[in-house]
């Protein structure tokens, strides 16, 4: 399977799955395509997912968004910056393979619709995204 990631809109809710005694999946809205085989995500320092990927770096990131994006990216994750912003770590996923879930029988027209209801959280999210974008170029 090819490992080239398509583009997806800013704010797309992705689902990060990590290993452990049982699978663990969480929504992640701060996910940035940083190249054809690289994704950057931001995780709060206290997240169980962060502890899990430190113990076992194998992860899967499901992405569903407008533009008919329906895929799961499989790879290894590592923390590349512990304090991206206060209490948030930057995680790099080196994608080894991409499973495309698209079919001729349907089209993904939109991802999850969501918005911040707290202005402080919204401002922090913008700060996190800007910091991820600064890490994106290699």
Tell what function each PLM region has.
Residues 1-138:
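Binding-site signature for planar aromatic cofactors or substrates
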């Amino acid at each position: 399977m090819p490992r080239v990631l398509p583009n997806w809109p800013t704010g797309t809710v992705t689902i990060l799955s990590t290993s452990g005694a049982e699978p663990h999946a969480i929504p992640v809205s701060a996910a940035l395509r940083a190249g054809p085989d690289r994704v950057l995500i931001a995780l709060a320092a206290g997240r169980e997912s962060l502890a899990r990927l430190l113990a076992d770096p194998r992860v899967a990131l499901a992405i569903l968004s407008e533009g008919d994006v329906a895929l799961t990216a499989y790879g290894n994750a590592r923390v590349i910056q512990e304090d991206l912003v206060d209490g948030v770590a930057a995680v790099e996923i080196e994608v080894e393979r991409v499973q495309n879930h698209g079919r001729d029988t349907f089209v993904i027209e939109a991802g999850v619709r969501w918005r911040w209801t707290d202005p402080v959280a919204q401002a922090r999210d913008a700060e996190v995204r800007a910091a991820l974008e600064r890490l994106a170029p290699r």
